[in-house]
Amino acid sequence: MSHHIVEVRDLCHCYPDGTEALRGITFRIHHGESVAVVGANGAGKSTLLLHLNGYLAPTRGDVRIGDTPVVRTTLPEVRRTVGMVFQDPDDQLFMPTVFDDVAFGPLNLGLPPAEVERRVADALEQVGVAHLHNKPPYRLSGGEKRRVAIATVLSMSPDILVLDEPTTGLDPYARRQIMGLLRDFKHTKIITSHDLDMVMELCERTIVLREGRVAADGPTRDIFGNDELLATCRLERPLSMQGCPVCGR
């Protein structure tokens, strides 16, 4: 599989209740890009991400990872390349211990036990929670759960990391740790978030969704400097671009 391009073409998704969540989404992301997907609640961000490794199937259009279409028959191959971190880490952590959760993916690849242990150790070390390997996930803090959820994906050695609201609910210290971890991941990153200051720091490109459509796609600073666009899409400038609330500078 060529890992250099994530391509979404005329992607539409309609839920069983008739809700049109995505309406003709088209974009291309090259290997190594760090791209944010932003928009108001209900704009279609999470629905879009769930198509990138086949958790949802399109009503119309298609998604490709390199030359490989994301369809039922290619899901094992696609999911080795595209690692998905869900918004709620409790959706991702379901085994008795942290080690078991992080080992789950590599074991299902049929890797030898020694390789599984190496991958688990490396992934936990990368996210700074190696000391938690024997703990049950329900005993972890929110920030610890978030890091372990990322480790479950890193243990699969993905080329593309997809994250849905990775800093939601974290205290400032845990948020900064997660941002440092994501900054160190050198492959492709696709991130949805309402944390626009994080987006400013981590993503050179931003795609704005509005009512299931792409409203804008371009350099992050240009997007957040367009007040008319932000108002139309029910967004605001990041705090770092708003200036001092007292003196206006």
UniProtKB/Swiss-Prot annotation:
Q: Describe its membrane topology.
A: Peripheral membrane protein
Enzyme's top EC category: translocase
**Record-level GO cellular component terms:** ATP-binding cassette (ABC) transporter complex
For the ligand (ATP), the binding residues are G39, A40, N41, G42, A43, G44, K45, S46
Do the record's keywords include Electron transport?
no
GO biological process entries: cobalt ion transport
Q: Which SMART domains match?
A: AAA
Q: Which domain of life is it from?
A: Bacteria
Q: Where in the cell is it found?
A: Cell inner membrane
Which keywords does this chain's UniProt record carry? ATP-binding, Cell inner membrane, Cell membrane, Membrane, Nucleotide-binding, Translocase, Transport
Instruction: Provide the GO MF annotations for this entry.
Output: ATP binding; ATP hydrolysis activity; ATPase-coupled transmembrane transporter activity
Q: Which Pfam families match?
A: ABC_tran
Query: Residues in domain ABC transporter?
Result: 6-236
Which coarse location class applies to the principal site listed for this UniProt protein? membrane
Enzyme Commission numbers on file: 7.-.-.-
What PROSITE patterns has UniProt attached to this entry? ABC_TRANSPORTER_1, ABC_TRANSPORTER_2
InterPro entries (UniProt xref) = AAA+_ATPase, ABC_transporter-like_ATP-bd, ABC_transporter-like_CS, ABC_transpr_CbiO/EcfA_su, Co_trans_ATP-bd, ECF_ABC_transporter_ATP-bd, P-loop_NTPase
What the protein does? Answer: Probably part of an ABC transporter complex. Responsible for energy coupling to the transport system.
Instruction: Say which family it is in.
Output: Belongs to the ABC transporter superfamily.
Q: What is this protein called?
A: Putative ABC transporter ATP-binding protein GSU1281
Q: Which organism is it from?
A: Geobacter sulfurreducens (strain ATCC 51573 / DSM 12127 / PCA)
